Amino acid sequence: MTQQHPLVRLVNSTSLVSQILVGLVFGILLAMFMPEWAKTAGLLGSLFVGALKAVAPLLVFVLVMAAIIGHKQGQKTNMKPILLLYLLGTFLAAAVAVVASFLFPSNLHLVANSAEITPPGGITEVLQTLLFNVVTNPVKALLDANYIGILAWAIGLGIAMRHASEGTKAVITDLSHGVSTIVKAVIRCAPLGILGLVASTLAETGFDALFGYAQLLVVLIGCMLFIAFVVNPLIVFWKIKRNPYPLVLTCLKESGVTAFFTRSSAANIPVNMALAEKLRLPEDTYAVSIPLGATINMAGAAITITVLSMAAVHTLGMEVDLATAILLSVVATISACGASGVAGGSLLLIPLACSLFGISNDIAMQVVAVGFIIGVLQDSAETALNSSTDVLFTAAACMAEDETLLDAAPVPNSEA
């Protein structure tokens, strides 16, 4: 049996979060004590961002098409109330993020020539650009990273191929798995990429950039906490007409904590299943709704996409009217539903939202790089919100239909 090199064994046995933290610390130290070397280390960051730029368009195209093709027709799940809660929660999260971005605008350190950027004139121009992006050539859309066109073609082909042979569907599914594997390999390089990004950024712009990221992180986490402790309880109260906090806190404690550390909604599905069983929810419902929630219930992703996109807009000095902000919330909601099952999925969909404002893919990918720098906390908090909300909304919808579950569930209610 071949023995692994000790360094390889150490890397494989250490979590990606820990590796990113090490890369972050080394990047800061390099910028502080060896600024010239830090600027050279920027090559690692450039390679990492370049790899992301290369794989992101294909990733969106294949995953969306595979998801639509794989949908089972005629499957009776009684999922309408839960689906409504999923979409409502995701949209409200995006809307809260828009408001927070206006109240607490964040600026990023981006390398951009403002003369090359033409901001849209308003909602009419944005919609016109959207329409023309939809009808673009699919190959050109992939080459130009036109995510609106990519989404349109992926959805269209997915619907058209839903009646294809099982062999064809299997090929598309295998292709999506292959692309996801490549993405995971790129993400494994995140510690080195972040080391280079942090080192070169701090060496060139000083430590003000780090404080700028701190403010951005506060806005992101603040929005997620507001959704978890204010908006979600209001939605649950609307459904069950009782004090929502016992149920909310139970879901956060038993689902959110584990999701925070695993940073994977898919990995947290067994935890949510066990909690749903503990809450005595109907198995026919939660067996479908929880895996589905891990795919489309993405409040945290909607917040990430919106806040980082708005930060790019503020940095570039663009003005955003109310109608465009609402459209951004809708686009972020739809985009977030495609962010599941992919490491860094929400970050890779930021260019789609940025395209609404005429921001080039090069600049948008710099924003994605910023997201990876703060991703140690951002991704963990995002996953905790996403995954705990899956079981929360499933429980709320079931309890609204069957009031006996309110008394049977092992959480205190307000009437006790």
Curated annotation (Swiss-Prot):
It is found in: Cell inner membrane. GO terms for biological process: serine transport; threonine transport. InterPro entries: Na-dicarboxylate_symporter, Na:dicarbo_symporter_sf, Ser_Thr_transp_SstT. It is a multi-pass membrane protein. Keywords: Amino-acid transport, Cell inner membrane, Cell membrane, Membrane, Symport, Transmembrane, Transmembrane helix, Transport. It catalyses: L-serine(in) + Na(+)(in) = L-serine(out) + Na(+)(out); L-threonine(in) + Na(+)(in) = L-threonine(out) + Na(+)(out). It comes from the Bacteria. GO terms for cellular component: plasma membrane. Gene3D superfamilies: Sodium:dicarboxylate symporter (1.10.3860.10). The keyword Transmembrane applies. The chain crosses the membrane at residues 15-35, 49-69, 82-102, 141-161, 192-212, 217-237, 288-308, 316-336, 363-383. Belongs to the dicarboxylate/amino acid:cation symporter (DAACS) (TC 2.A.23) family. Involved in the import of serine and threonine into the cell, with the concomitant import of sodium (symport system). This is Serine/threonine transporter SstT. It comes from Aeromonas hydrophila subsp. hydrophila (strain ATCC 7966 / DSM 30187 / BCRC 13018 / CCUG 14551 / JCM 1027 / KCTC 2358 / NCIMB 9240 / NCTC 8049).
